[in-house]
């Protein structure tokens, strides 16, 4: 797998499979909190707890807590599929920083919205915000890649991000569920800011270049990876 030519890395490149380490940590925390609900509440992000009990560590720990096996499975599946590919491009240290920081930022942004809208009893848990950031990063690292939806429908990775953005906005505005659509959107926002500020890359320009040059007759670039 070749890295995109436009990429620069602030950290010296290292690789030690940080993605797998994150998966293991998530699984361990899941079983610890599954049998100890008090621990689950202490680690999940709760506006009320943060404001009244100063439990600021929740901005970090919430992304390792999951409410059920299905929640855990799909998040870890997404992390493995997209995380390994991104980590190979930016290196393990950068990937860890990216994943953890984006998870904190997406949770913090959600916290502010919940606070301003009077939703102090909302409990936020799960790696979804960070996973959406990883999906965004995949679309930047592999803009020519096609992701196969339902196993047969190929969609360019940048287009997939756009589709998910629309879906999450619609779900947030017009439906009611216990899914943190707002945090998913903030995961995209956090990743966008990370690439702009930390990596010096404008994802919009990257995607525009790819989509404008998208011609079935042209030679494909060396950053293709189909999933």
Enumerate the predicted regions with their spans.
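C-terminal transmembrane module of polytopic alpha-helical membrane proteins
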Residues: 1-17, 21-27, 93, 167-227
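Helical transmembrane-bundle signal
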Residues: 26, 30, 106-107, 161, ...
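Extracytosolic (periplasmic/ER-lumenal) interhelical loops and adjacent juxtamembrane/interface segments
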Residues: 39-64
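Multi-pass alpha-helical transmembrane bundles in non-GPCR membrane proteins
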Residues: 135-168
């Amino acid at each position: 797998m070749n890295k995109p030519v436009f990429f620069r890395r602030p950290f010296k490149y290292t690789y030690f499979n940080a993605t797998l380490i994150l998966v293991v940590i998530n699984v361990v925390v899941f079983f610890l909190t599954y049998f100890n609900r008090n621990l689950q509440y202490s680690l999940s992000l709760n506006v009320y707890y943060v404001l009244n009990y100063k439990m600021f560590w929740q901005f970090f720990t919430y992304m390792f807590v999951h409410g059920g096996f299905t929640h855990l499975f799909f998040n870890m599946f997404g992390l493995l599929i997209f995380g390994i590919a991104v980590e190979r491009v930016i290196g393990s240290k950068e990937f860890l920083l990216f994943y953890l920081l984006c998870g904190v930022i997406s949770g913090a942004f959600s916290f502010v919205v919940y606070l301003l809208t009077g939703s102090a009893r909302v409990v936020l848990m799960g790696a979804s915000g960070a996973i959406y950031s990883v999906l965004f990063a995949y679309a930047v690292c592999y803009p020519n890649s096609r992701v196969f939806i339902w196993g047969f429908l190929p969609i360019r990775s940048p287009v997939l991000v756009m589709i998910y953005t629309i879906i999450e906005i619609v779900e947030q505005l017009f439906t009611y569920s216990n899914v943190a659509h707002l945090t998913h959107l903030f995961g995209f926002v956090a990743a966008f800011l990370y690439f702009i500020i930390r990596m010096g890359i404008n994802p919009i320009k990257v995607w525009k270049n790819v989509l404008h040059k998208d011609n079935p007759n042209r030679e494909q670039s060396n950053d293709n990876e189909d999933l």
